Amino acid sequence: MPFRILSLDGGGVRGIVAAKMLANIEKQINQPLNQYFDLIVGTSTGSIIAAGIATGRSCEDIVEFFQFKSSSIFPYESLFSLQRIPLLLKYGISAPKYSDNNLIQVLKGVFGETKLLDIGTSPRLLVVAYDTIERNPIIFKSWRPDKPYGNVPLWEVCVSSASAPTYFPAHKIDKRVIA
């Protein structure tokens, strides 16, 4: 029996393109993708899509997520928006383009208190982030209770992965700065 892997990368709101393609695949195979793939991997926006699929959401639901929530996650287009002043005061000239407050609230609303280990092995979920202080990748695995971060809420795993430098501030888990 083949071991099927789905790998999803970042791209901000362009994640809707991947979600629409996956919704089409889901229709074609007439099966939820969390039952079709053995391992789902994601980084940045791909981590949000991957976590959605791994927790049993349909790809149509994920498309709707992007349609209705992206404007609150990315609330303005210009670096010179007045909404950005608090970020500039906090971080100076290297301030990220967006605050992560809305991203956090939206993902908490989607994933609630679900922890990474709650997903388990069917399918396995792997999310990639980066420790900006230690300069090492952080690999979140849903199937490894012996590894760190298993009890981290899924929303926080996704925020860590989506905290791309220049777009969102780095996210801290256990005092480690992760982007």
Give residue spans per PLM region:
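Patatin-like phospholipase
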Residues: 2-7, 12-107, 141-147, 151-158
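Structural motif corresponding to the C-terminal cap of alpha-helices
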Residues: 25-29, 111, 162, 166
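Surface-exposed acidic, glycine-flexible loop patches that form ligand/cofactor-binding
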Residues: 29-34, 108-123
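Short secondary-structure junctions and interdomain/linker hinges
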Residues: 73, 114, 164-168
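Active-site gating loop/helix substructures
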Residues: 119-179
